């Protein structure tokens, strides 16, 4: 897979005869950021930072709680700034390897968005910063994979703006 490619796997998409069965998608993203793994790791686990970069364009975000430890939970909501409609989601931190790996679950409060997503973030120090890989598994078919991918792209632009800024104290 090349950087910036949409990569999703869904047996329902591969075999049109299986359309009636709900099959989750997998979204994979790759990015290199001009920031240290430590800074990026912190941006994923700090409530104030997440509100700054995670909501896609046109949305505001709120962290209701975030307990960044293995077994700890979090709850967030995104609100469409134009319509005022909110959707909330939360999950549990499954694995935290400082500055290298974050694994957590995601589950929407909306019963029309079923299932539990698994998200894996990997960070690798490279010569010009950090290689960031994101794998989001279990995205329900009711969420078009390309829209999920598009939302992540917007969020990662905002993440780059946050972590790549060099502002003197």
Q: How does the language model describe each region?
A:
Residues 1-13:
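Intrinsically disordered, low-complexity segments enriched in serine/proline and basic residues
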Residues 28-29, 48-86, 167-169:
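Short beta-edge strand/loop motif at the mouth of beta-sheet-based domains
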Residues 31, 63-66, 89-95, 117-124:
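Hydrophobic/aromatic beta-strand elements that line small-molecule binding cavities or substrate pockets
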Residues 40, 50, 74, 93, ...:
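Hydrophobic pocket/interface hotspot
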Residues 45, 156-167:
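Short amphipathic alpha-helical signal-transduction/dimerization elements
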Residues 97-102:
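Short, conserved beta-turn/loop elements at beta-strand boundaries and strand-helix junctions
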Residues 103-153:
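Beta-strand/loop substructures that line and gate deep hydrophobic ligand-binding cavities in soluble
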